[in-house]
């Protein structure tokens, strides 16, 4: 079994990178997010590997961290989610954003990934909501706000700020994270306009 590869980036395709390890080129499939993080051809990099052995092929999937690899495995535990859909979800949302979307029951954000319809988005939420703690804690500030928003106990200004950012085109997990950071800096009594203004600055970083 291959658990990690370290080598030179040879070239990139739409869904994979060819990694040159001591003269041997390995085709490693990655999410679009991971591919964007890789250095230019000729530079050295390392990827954690998930190897899937099938009757007709052996496929390697690469990840920049253990958390990303764990999410890849966890997503595929849901019926209807294969490697392609799992990578599509990871290309769209970071590990933290995935956890937030599931905690918020945000089917819309999950449904933006190719291959994920409303029914599969609902199944992801139902089957994974109790499994996320095994992957480590989500950012505590964001987690508290997303749970409070789902329960209707978050400050009204915070809820309105999240809605305003979503209406501007941002995903709900990203908006919730930005507002959570803004609340920490400005305080829970911060007015709506200040939360939106600070949230936009956070999202622009």
Curated annotation (Swiss-Prot):
Location(s), subcellular: Cytoplasm
UniProt-listed Pfam families: HHH_5, RuvA_C, RuvA_N
Major localisation: cytoplasm
Stretches for region Domain II: 65-143
Keywords for this protein: Cytoplasm, DNA damage, DNA recombination, DNA repair, DNA-binding
Domain notes: Has three domains with a flexible linker between the domains II and III and assumes an 'L' shape. Domain III is highly mobile and contacts RuvB.
Protein purpose: The RuvA-RuvB-RuvC complex processes Holliday junction (HJ) DNA during genetic recombination and DNA repair, while the RuvA-RuvB complex plays an important role in the rescue of blocked DNA replication forks via replication fork reversal (RFR). RuvA specifically binds to HJ cruciform DNA, conferring on it an open structure. The RuvB hexamer acts as an ATP-dependent pump, pulling dsDNA into and through the RuvAB complex. HJ branch migration allows RuvC to scan DNA until it finds its consensus sequence, where it cleaves and resolves the cruciform DNA.
UniProt subunit comment: Homotetramer. Forms an RuvA(8)-RuvB(12)-Holliday junction (HJ) complex. HJ DNA is sandwiched between 2 RuvA tetramers; dsDNA enters through RuvA and exits via RuvB. An RuvB hexamer assembles on each DNA strand where it exits the tetramer. Each RuvB hexamer is contacted by two RuvA subunits (via domain III) on 2 adjacent RuvB subunits; this complex drives branch migration. In the full resolvosome a probable DNA-RuvA(4)-RuvB(12)-RuvC(2) complex forms which resolves the HJ.
Official protein name in the record: Holliday junction branch migration complex subunit RuvA
């Amino acid at each position: 079994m291959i658990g990690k590869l370290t080598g030179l980036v040879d070239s990139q395709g739409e869904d994979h990178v060819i990694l040159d390890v001591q003269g041997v080129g390995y085709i490693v499939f990655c999410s679009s997010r991971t591919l964007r993080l890789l250095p230019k051809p000729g530079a050295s990099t390392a990827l954690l590997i998930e190897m899937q052995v099938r009757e007709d092929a052996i496929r390697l999937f690469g990840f920049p961290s253990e958390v990303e690899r764990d999410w890849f495995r966890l997503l595929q535990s849901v019926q209807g989610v294969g490697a392609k859909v799992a990578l599509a979800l990871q290309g769209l949302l970071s590990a933290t954003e995935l956890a937030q979307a599931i905690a918020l029951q945000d089917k819309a954000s999950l449904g933006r990934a190719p291959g994920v319809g409303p029914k599969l988005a609902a199944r992801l939420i139902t089957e994974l909501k109790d499994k996320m703690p095994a992957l480590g804690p989500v950012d505590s500030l964001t987690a508290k706000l997303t749970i409070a928003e789902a329960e209707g106990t978050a400050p009204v200004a915070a809820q309105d700020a999240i809605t305003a950012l979503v209406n501007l085109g941002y995903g709900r997990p990203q908006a919730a994270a930005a507002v959570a950071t803004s609340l920490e800096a400005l305080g829970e009594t911060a007015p709506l306009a200040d939360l939106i203004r600070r949230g936009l600055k956070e999202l622009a970083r």
